[in-house]
Design a protein with these regions (language model features):
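Active-site activation/catalytic loop segments of kinase-like enzymes and analogous catalytic loops
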Residues: 295-337, 353-371
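Amphipathic alpha-helical interaction surfaces in cytosolic regulatory modules
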Residues: 27-99
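STAS-typified acidic loop motif
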Residues: 2-35, 53-55
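ATP/Mg2+ or Mg2+-diphosphate-binding catalytic cores
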Residues: 341, 355-397
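Conserved N-terminal boundary motif of the eukaryotic protein kinase catalytic domain
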Residues: 107-115
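Catalytic activation segment of kinase domains across protein kinase-like and atypical kinase folds
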Residues: 272-296
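An alpha-helical support segment within catalytic cores of ATP-dependent transferases
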Residues: 106, 214-264, 268-269, 274
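ATP-binding pocket architecture of kinase catalytic cores
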Residues: 114-219
Length: 397
């Protein structure tokens, strides 16, 4: 007997609903299926339609025509979780060229695994001596996860020391990426346990940063950091005065254009130390742009966070005193030719730019409460907006 069931799941952090389809879709019930999808379209008129076919056993040409009809109505479709049999139907008919279609993803458990890094987009766990996994926040879309995996692969091919990504998996209701990482320990853990060794590691830390910033990327493979920040500022605009939004965008636009690779969230929790040297992980915000985009984020996490919220810094990355010492040594090693006075001027400049991290926090951290968002933005109102005119156009290195 032909039957099809359609239900909608709308996660708290998701911008689009997930429409779960189960059973069979054939000529007998294709019109019923179309009607249920039309109801979903009316209820959620904006954005993509994400169809979860994990529980779908079969789809006939009649069902495919229903999907084609939605496409002709300019609704973007993303089909996830297909069984090998259903995926074969999409592939044989050429529909994989029309829609984003992905196969069912295997599940992995992180129960009992050590957390080695945490951030706004998710947490990184040590699965075994050879494997780590980044688990994304609940509700993050599969397309975003796949994009990060692709970015990591492109960075690896560019010669950037990073873990080899080899599979996208499910962890409960979240997605994750498995990475090969041989006998690795995070730099944050090493410096937390052995603070006296910080000078031993800082040269390699800065060398890795310099290697990244001397590697060119292309817009076809990597997103512009300016575009990322503009999108984030647009998202935060609902919390800000129009004048402050314009000033923030002017500050971003005043940064000299570069085609160099930028990590976007570099701190010792995102650096793994292996027998082969240091490697970067968590490339969710990697793009191309001026190195200041990395240095402002480092100033935000190493200096501003350590001083203004030491308990938070300790929980997310490591001891605040370690972060402050690492920041000081990193700055001196990254700008070896600057005098003491020049270095103080550059640090003051970077600490000002670092308040942009407060402005984009609502976009970067979708799980932040309204109270937390207001706290971040108040920091920007006090420490960025009064000096923003002085910062605009000030990057001359």
């Amino acid at each position: 007997m032909s039957n099809v069931s359609v239900e909608t799941k709308f996660g708290s952090e998701m911008s689009e609903p997930v429409i779960i389809c189960s059973g069979r879709i054939d000529s007998v019930n294709a019109s019923e299926f179309a009607g249920k999808l039309d109801e979903c379209c009316e209820k959620y008129p904006e954005g993509s339609l994400i169809l979860d076919f994990e529980r779908l056993d079969y789809i006939s040409s009649a069902g495919l025509r229903v999907l084609l009809g939605l496409s002709e109505k300019n609704r973007s479709l993303e089909i996830i979780g297909t069984s090998p049999e259903v995926y074969d139907i999409f592939e044989t008919t050429g529909f994989v060229e029309l829609f984003s279609v992905s196969k069912k993803i295997k599940s992995v458990s992180v129960e009992g695994c050590e957390i080695i890094s945490q951030g706004a987009s998710g947490s990184v766990y040590l699965i075994d001596t050879d494997t780590i996994i980044k688990v994304f926040m609940p509700g993050e879309k599969l397309s975003v996860v796949q994009q990060e995996r692709n970015t990591a692969q492109k960075a690896f091919l560019k010669g950037i020391p990073t873990a080899i990504s080899y599979d996208v998996v499910k962890v409960g209701d979240s997605y994750g990426i498995l990475y090969e990482m041989l006998k690795a320990q995070s730099l944050a853990n090493i410096l937390t346990e052995h603070p006296a060794r910080i000078e031993e590691y800082v040269n390699d830390y800065v060398d890795l940063l310099r290697q990244l910033h001397s590697t060119s990327g292309d817009r076809g493979s990597f997103t512009s950091m300016k575009d990322i920040y503009h999108e984030a500022i647009d998202y935060s605009a609902k919390y800000l005065d129009d004048k402050d939004v314009r000033k923030c965008k002017a500050l971003i636009d005043s940064i000299p254009d570069r085609d160099t690779l930028v990590h976007g969230d570099l701190h010792p929790g995102n650096i793994m130390v292996t027998d082969a040297g240091m490697m970067m992980i968590d490339l969710s915000r990697m793009g191309i742009g001026h190195p200041v985009f990395d240095l402002l984020e480092m100033a935000a996490s190493h200096k501003n966070l350590a001083e203004s919220a030491p308990d938070v810094a300790r929980m997310l990355i490591g001891p605040p005193e370690m972060l402050l010492r690492l920041w000081d040594l990193t700055l001196r090693n990254y700008f070896p030719d600057k005098s003491g006075e020049e270095l103080k001027k550059t640090e003051k400049q970077l600490l000002g730019f670092a308040r942009l991290a407060n402005v984009i926090a609502p976009f970067i951290g979708p799980t932040l409460s309204e109270e937390q968002i207001e706290g971040f933005l108040n920091e920007a109102r006090v420490n960025l907006f009064p000096i923003i005119d002085d910062l605009i156009g000030s990057i001359d290195w």
